[in-house]
């Protein structure tokens, strides 16, 4: 066998080792993540694991609301309806856009965000 052939074989072997190593690492990481999620869901269903008080104040509620509004209605709508009005309820925050006097038609968004986990409880837009 020629030296050139041996070099090519070594390169192919090295490349294959790298590919297999990456696959094994990626699979193990995915499997561990999937296992962790299963454990968390099991504990949550038993009431042992719950997120509490994640959205502690108005500032966090406003940030989340703006992110959700931008994602759903776009940057322009999020900016046009500022300043936002916020109301604190027992278990949630209600954030609403502001309608400006120069707007003839249309409504504003309203979103209710859970205090414990930041879930969207209600989300809509007036017409």
Curated annotation (Swiss-Prot):
Pfam families registered for this protein in UniProt: Imm-NTF2-2 (PF15631)
InterPro entries attached to this UniProt entry: NTF2_fold_dom
Protein name according to UniProt: Uncharacterized protein YhhH
Taxonomic source organism: Escherichia coli (strain K12)
Lineage per the UniProt record: Bacteria, Pseudomonadati, Pseudomonadota, Gammaproteobacteria, Enterobacterales
């Amino acid at each position: 066998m020629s030296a050139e052939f041996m070099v090519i074989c070594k390169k192919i072997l090295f490349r294959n080792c790298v590919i297999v190593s990456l696959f094994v690492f990626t699979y193990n990481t995915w499997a561990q993540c999937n296992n962790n999620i299963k454990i968390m869901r099991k504990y949550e269903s038993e009431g042992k694991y719950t997120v509490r008080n994640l959205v502690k104040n108005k500032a966090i509620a406003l940030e989340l609301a703006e992110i959700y509004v931008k994602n759903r209605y776009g940057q322009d709508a999020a900016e046009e309806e500022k300043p936002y009005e916020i109301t604190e309820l027992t278990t949630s925050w209600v954030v609403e856009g502001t309608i400006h006097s120069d707007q003839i038609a249309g409504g504003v968004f309203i979103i209710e965000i859970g205090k414990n986990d930041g879930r969207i409880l209600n989300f809509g837009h007036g017409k």
